[in-house]
Amino acid sequence: MTCLSAARSGHLEVLKWARQHDCPWSSSTCAFAAAGGHLEVLKWAREHHGPWDSATCFFAAAGGHLDVLRWAREHGCDWDELTCAYAAGGGHLEVLQWVREHHCPWDEGTSDHAAAAGHLEVLRWAREHHCPWSRSTCHRAAMGGHLEVLQWAREHNCPWDAGQCASVADEQGHAEVAQWVRAPAP
């Protein structure tokens, strides 16, 4: 836990001390450093054979830490669809654009995360670039109370289950969303 806490907080000297005293670490150490945008901590961990995995990239993306993400990719860190999804969920359009320029895969999770967090600009960009979406995209927008996102998604033919969207909006206290979903179509 000491290595994780040090990495998450960006305390390189604490991490060095912990490793000198045989404190165990895992791929989460690098992922937590990336999540906090602590590039120097990440570099040190990798120089000392700290393990990493795709979580390093998706946590860097979630935090909008493009410098960390670039460095990780330049040094061979794997990534997957969650990198795009977490960038979208964090509202980090510049990061999402960069990862797609560098051929990071995506799936409907990118649209879902953008909708869940109310990031309409990110969702628009993703759809303009042919990112898939599903009924879950509308469901997540309704759950988050993001009426503008839900309206835009429906105007652009995103599939949905109106009953589920209304129910989840009610459950989450988003009366305006539930009313809009239940309103008769013009």
Where are these regions (language model features)?
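Ankyrin repeat (ANK) tandem alpha-helical domains that serve as protein-protein interaction scaffolds
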Residues: 1-186
